[in-house]
């Protein structure tokens, strides 16, 4: 998944509670937090829908990734009545070098979480909801039931709300993937995040080809598919274009392309700041390949304008039906 904050104040090189720093984290921390270029900025546009949701979330004690990850796009997404929820707990059984979610032993599975998320979607009056979560390799089903049940509960309470489900790879297990696909989210997302050459370094518990296979399986089940690429972690422009070709050939319908923002000193250093005009060029390349939906920019995140991208892709994929607005 893609969970990166809007930036870091430079703190955070200390080990997370309950474990020591990994050797990789110690090495990462030797590089100071990078100064962001002037184009990495966002304006707070607090419209009436945003203000209403902000008040409701605070009053009801609801939790969204939008707020907790400090997403720079919260103002736009909430104005569109879109939000993202994290399921499965606060500890992930895998560690990706860009992700702010901590690695450790997860808490027990909370079987009531799907209902609570669905009620939050209902309370917020969302038009489109994105659900993401941690990897749960500690569970026999890898958390497949939790992901599928959350979609079912959201749809039961909110029949006119679109649901985008961003999943781990479930180790490529066809039965577990089928269990998740049967919940029929409007969009099935699985993020590749980076290019083959540096994939193992950045995402050691995942496999590039396996991630592509997850998207192919979802495509074959007639789901609208989506993925994400994070730039600035050491890839070259040619490698980005090759990854886009791979994703399109694997059956990916929607692609988002983003700039890596380092969550803390113990995370992978920013190798370079990709210029806005480069993001435009990558978007044009992706559109030329035939992706049904493309968003590319320094502050784009994988769930940014998710409902709009789905509606755009659905028009080009007749089996998909956009949610009622």
Curated annotation (Swiss-Prot):
CDD domains: Radical_SAM
Amino acids binding [4Fe-4S] cluster 2: 92, 96, 99
HAMAP family: Lipoyl_synth (MF_00206)
Name used for this protein in its record: Lipoyl synthase
Species of provenance: Mycobacterium sp. (strain KMS)
Pathway assignment: Protein modification; protein lipoylation via endogenous pathway; protein N(6)-(lipoyl)lysine from octanoyl-[acyl-carrier-protein]: step 2/2
Keyword Metal-binding: yes
Annotated Radical SAM core domain residues: 78-292
Localization per Swiss-Prot or TrEMBL: Cytoplasm
Main location: cytoplasm
